[in-house]
């Protein structure tokens, strides 16, 4: 589903595909990390967020295609998915998404 046409907020989890635009790791305080990955397509963008999972930063790099499955929320003026399931490389029509 194009990111821009996904319902926000989504009552059910949705599958969106996009290209990684940025990867950012924040450390707001000792013992806490927040990983934010911005993915976008022609219709819009969504920020994927994980808490205390810094190892996931190695899985993403700018320019790669990603499929994300989760509930979309509207937070801080943008679409956001918290702790979504992801697949690197996006999805083709023949593939299914395995969480």
Q: Which functions belong to the PLM regions below?
A:
Residues 6-12, 26-99:
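Upstream accessory/linker segments immediately N-terminal to the RecA-like ATPase cores of bacterial MutS
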């Amino acid at each position: 589903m194009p990111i821009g046409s996904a319902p926000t907020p989504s009552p059910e989890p949705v599958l969106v595909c996009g290209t990684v635009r940025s990867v950012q790791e924040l450390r707001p305080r000792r013992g806490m990390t927040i990983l934010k990955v911005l993915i976008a397509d022609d219709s819009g963008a969504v920020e994927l967020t994980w808490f205390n999972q810094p190892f996931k930063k190695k899985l993403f790099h700018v320019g790669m295609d990603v499929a994300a499955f989760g509930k979309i929320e509207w937070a801080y003026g943008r679409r956001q998915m918290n702790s979504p399931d992801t697949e690197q490389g996006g999805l083709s029509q023949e593939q299914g998404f395995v969480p």
